[in-house]
C-alpha cells in the first residue's frame, strides 16, 4: 500500500537503455499530484540531463514541476572529473538545518577538493558563456532536421529536447520490426559513422542480447553544449550520409 512507498524516482528524459523516451508534460504533473497526495517523495534522476543538456538547467523545468530531491553528475563538472551531487528542497533540508537530524553520508572521496573546484568552474563557464541558452537555441536548430531524418526508411521516430535527440532505427518502418542481434546492425552503423567522421554513444542494449522490448536501435545525438549552427549542419550532413550508406548495407528500403 501507499504507506510502504517512500519515494518515486525516474529520469525526466531518457538517455540510454530506455530508448530516449520522453513522457508527456501531463505525466510528471500527475506524478507530482499523486506523490503529494500520499506523502511520497519525488526524486528526479538528472545525472545525464542536468546542467543544460535539454536546453534548460534541469530537464524537470520543461514540465513546470518541482521535485523533492534531485541527483546530478556528469555535467556538473563538464565531465572533466568524476563528480556527483544530491540537491534537496527546503522542506527536505529543514530538519538538518534546524539540527534535528543528521546527514550521515560520508565516504572516502566525498567533497574531493579537485572535483569541487572543477564543478564550481564548470558552472561559472556555463553562465559566462551562456551555454544553457545556447543548448536551447542550437537544439531548436537541430530539431529543424527532424523531418529530414524521419524521411529515412529506417527512422521510425525522433524525440527529445535541446541537444539531446534520439532517433529510433528499425528494419521495417511499416511493421516497426527491430533488428535481430544476429545482424549486428549497431556495430555496422558505428563503423560507417566513424568512417564519415562521427562518433555516437554506443547503446548496444539490443545487440548484446535480444531486447526485453521489441524496439528499434536508439541513436543518441548529444553534441557539446558549445556547438554552433554550422557545426550542427555539418553533423546532420554526415549523419544523413551515414544513414543512407547503412540502410543500403542492411537492406533497408
Language-model regions, residue ranges each:
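Conserved N-terminal phosphate-binding loop of PLP-dependent enzymes in the Aspartate aminotransferase
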Residues: 1-253
Amino acid at each position: 500500500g501507499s504507506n510502504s512507498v517512500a519515494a518515486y524516482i525516474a529520469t525526466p528524459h531518457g538517455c540510454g537503455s530506455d530508448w530516449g523516451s520522453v513522457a508527456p508534460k501531463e505525466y510528471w504533473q500527475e506524478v507530482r499530484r499523486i506523490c503529494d497526495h500520499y506523502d511520497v517523495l519525488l526524486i528526479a534522476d538528472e545525472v545525464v540531463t542536468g546542467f543544460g543538456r535539454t536546453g534548460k538547467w534541469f530537464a524537470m523545468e520543461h514540465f513546470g514541476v518541482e521535485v523533492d530531491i534531485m541527483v546530478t553528475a556528469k555535467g556538473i563538472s563538464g565531465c572533466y572529473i568524476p563528480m556527483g551531487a544530491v540537491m534537496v528542497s527546503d522542506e527536505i533540508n529543514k530538519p538538518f538545518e534546524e539540527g534535528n537530524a543528521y546527514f550521515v553520508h560520508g565516504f572516502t572521496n566525498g567533497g574531493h577538493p579537485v572535483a569541487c573546484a572543477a564543478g564550481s568552474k564548470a558552472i561559472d563557464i556555463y553562465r559566462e558563456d551562456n551555454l544553457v541558452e545556447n543548448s536551447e537555441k542550437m537544439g531548436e536548430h537541430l530539431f529543424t532536421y527532424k523531418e529530414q531524418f524521419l524521411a529515412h526508411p529506417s527512422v521510425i521516430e525522433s524525440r527529445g529536447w535541446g541537444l539531446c535527440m534520439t532517433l529510433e532505427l528499425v528494419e521495417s518502418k511499416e511493421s516497426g520490426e527491430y533488428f535481430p542481434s544476429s545482424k549486428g546492425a549497431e556495430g555496422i552503423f558505428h563503423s560507417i559513422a566513424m568512417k564519415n567522421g562521427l562518433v555516437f554513444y554506443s547503446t548496444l542494449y539490443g545487440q548484446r542480447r535480444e531486447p526485453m522490448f521489441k524496439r528499434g536501435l536508439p541513436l543518441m545525438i548529444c553534441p557539446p553544449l558549445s556547438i554552433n549552427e554550422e557545426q550542427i549542419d555539418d553533423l546532420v550532413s554526415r549523419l544523413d550520409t551515414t544513414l543512407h550508406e547503412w540502410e543500403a548495407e542492411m537492406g533497408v528500403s
